[in-house]
Design a protein with these regions (language model features):
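Short, well-ordered alpha-helical segments
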Residues: 54-69
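Bacterial N-terminal signal peptides
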Residues: 7-15
Length: 107
């Protein structure tokens, strides 16, 4: 079950098509993996482009989290928490993630 959950969650980790994509935004330190399991702007105020990217990615993540929770008989919160754990493990050096206290940390 853990492998299935991990595969489902990571399938949407890097999906979207904007003028700036998620990889570029992470490379530039504009966005990172929030403790909630969703993408968030690291720098405030965020540009309209970054806000749009975050909203699009998070809408897809939420939909996937809901499907995964239903398939695995878990809660949305459990799925989001597990996604965050996996995302932090896979965060590239130089990219940001929130630590358990919510502080932005550069890996």
């Amino acid at each position: 079950m853990k492998k299935m959950l991990a595969a489902l969650l990571m399938s949407l980790a890097f999906t979207t098509a904007f003028a700036i994509d998620i990889g570029e935004a992470k490379d530039q330190g504009l966005v990172g993996e929030a403790r909630t399991g969703y993408l968030a702007a690291v720098q405030q105020p965020a540009s309209a482009e970054v806000k749009a990217l975050v909203a699009e990615v998070n809408a897809k993540r939420k939909a996937q989290f809901e499907r995964t929770a239903e398939k695995t008989d878990t809660t949305l919160l459990q799925v989001a928490n597990r996604f965050w754990e996996l995302a932090v493990e896979r965060t590239a050096p130089g990219h940001y993630y929130q630590d358990p206290s919510g502080r932005w940390t550069k890996k």
